[in-house]
Swiss-Prot record:
GO terms for biological process: proton motive force-driven plasma membrane ATP synthesis. GO terms for molecular function: ATP binding; proton-transporting ATP synthase activity, rotational mechanism. It comes from Ralstonia pickettii (strain 12J). This is ATP synthase gamma chain. Produces ATP from ADP in the presence of a proton gradient across the membrane. The gamma chain is believed to be important in regulating ATPase activity and the flow of protons through the CF(0) complex. Belongs to the ATPase gamma chain family.
Length: 291
């Protein structure tokens, strides 16, 4: 059994670790609230631009944007959204597992793939598995800006426009609530009328004709690019909210575990100290009896 000095050292070490995890838990809780506010603030814009895009798509303009033309999938792009930092439980592991499944399914169908990494963890993973990475953006910080994302996203959008790829998928962690986050892989392109108008009522409501200024092609070109960018930004915002929630939960679990370990070590320390005192008393009594 370890001596009292060694046990005290262990207790001190665990106490110091608990202080760190407790501080990280509090920081993550603060960042989580801000991330959730950003996520909620982005939703009205994404929803409004989806509504307008649905109007454009379902009004049957004479011009049909390439983003809305379905074709046989021989090559595909995959945008992978992960975190820059760790210590967030199984968040990255879960979404990267979904990415692995998606890549395997596409390869089994003979589909070539190219990827875009948003986040350091995704960049490192795609490099390890030998995936073709055509663009990336890392170190977004705690406040994502669309300006930082546009360059990496545009590589995939331009490839789709040029016919170099036939579909684009988006992988990220969807925020459900503080305790639950869900990894998802969604098809980003091509867009469909069913995706834009999510109900029959919407389809009927958006079925009238429009007069375009300056013309349908210019309006639809600009609108659909902004819509896709909004979808990716929303995914990044949800991923960041999920990251901070997962980190807060992970740090709370670490703090609770440290508290339990300290209690167990304290019990061992007390027993060891009691045994040492008992032994000393026994030696004193034995010495006195011998005299």
């Amino acid at each position: 059994m370890a001596g009292t000095k060694e046990i005290r050292t262990k207790i001190k070490s665990v106490q110091n670790t608990r202080k760190i995890t407790k501080a990280m838990e509090m920081v993550a809780a603060s960042k989580m609230r801000k991330a959730q506010e950003r996520m909620r603030a982005a939703r009205p814009y994404a929803e409004k631009i989806r509504n307008v895009a649905a109007h454009m798509a379902l009004a049957n303009p004479e011009y049909k944007h390439p983003f809305m033309v379905a074709r046989d999938i021989k090559r595909a792009g995959l945008i992978v959204v992960t975190t820059d930092k760790g210590l967030c439980g199984g968040l990255n592991t879960n979404v990267l597992r979904a990415v692995t499944t998606q890549l395997r399914d596409l390869q089994n169908k003979g589909v070539e793939t190219q990827t875009t990494a948003i986040g350091t963890k995704g960049m490192q993973f795609l490099g390890r598995v030998g995936a073709k990475v055509v663009s990336n953006v890392v170190h977004l910080g705690d406040t994502p800006h669309l300006e930082k994302l546009i360059g990496a996203i545009k590589v995939q959008l331009d490839a789709f426009n040029a016919g170099q790829i036939d579909a684009v998928y988006l992988a990220y962690t969807r925020f459900i609530n503080t305790m639950k986050q869900e990894p998802v892989v969604e098809q980003l392109l091509p867009l469909t009328a069913d995706k834009l108008a999510q109900s029959d009522a919407e389809k009927q409501a958006y079925s009238w004709d429009y007069i375009y200024e300056p013309d349908a092609q210019t309006v639809v070109d600009e609108l659909l690019i902004r819509y896709v960018e909004a979808l990716v930004y929303q995914a990044v915002a949800e991923n960041m909210a999920s990251e901070q929630s997962a980190r807060m939960v992970a740090m709370k679990a670490a703090s609770d575990n440290a508290k339990n370990v300290i209690g167990e070590l304290q019990l061992v320390y007390n027993k060891t100290r009691q045994a040492a005192i008992t032994k000393e008393l026994s030696e004193i009594v034995s010495g006195a009896a011998a005299v």
